[in-house]
Amino acid sequence: FRAVSGDIPDVSVLGNTLDEIARLGIEADQAILDAGFYSEKNIKLLCERNINFITRLPKSRTLFKTLTDQIGDIETRKYACMYGERALFIKEETISVCDTLMYAYIVLDPDKKAKDTRLLLKEALEKPDHDADVDLQIKKGGLFILISKTQIPLQEVLPAYYTRQNIEQVFGFAKSNNNLLPLRVHSRDAINGYLLLVFMTLSLFIMLRQKLQPKLTMDAALISLRNLKAKIYDKEIIPQELNKKSKTIFDQLEIMVPKMLGV
């Protein structure tokens, strides 16, 4: 991991991050990047280092407008894909970025488009003097574009990109489920030590969660296990009897509860 100050833009940290990874003896061959990292300089850097990547194209880019102007018949059966319970349309286009052949995946989410259109029309009708180009915004509603250095089967495009989101959700557990709020620290060693503890805690949390799902959530399991008590003596700890629910949870977690623990 790498700790970066919040006032440093994402687009400027990629080069140093790759350099640090290389100095650790790790060969980076894949990258999943949010739109904040997109720039011609970063794309060129990834290509020079032969790193395959997938990134979201910012809507402010000219390339975004060019591609959305060419979507044509995207809302047809042949471009339909399922991602979980979401039905979407995904269309592949071959493009050139930094003189390199790449693949653009234009994704249209019908539900998001309907929501965006409703909000835009509501605002336009309530504020007729509003200067925003409503027609253009409606045209872009529900659309986003992913750029990849390698060709990806349409059914695998969103799972590949949303791996990043899954990682972000994992760190969300550190703030919500685990109450691992950042400490007030004043040195890089302290924040790196804190992040190491977060990684260790999250690793344990995820391992336990995987064993419990889909029958039980971690929140429900931890609430149930609060009822587990123990008596503490001078030289030993004796856990009290488990109820049926606690036994089931420990069985799923493959954890054996000892009859006695030394102090």
Residues covered by each model-derived region:
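Anion-binding and metal-coordination hotspots
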Residues: F1-V263
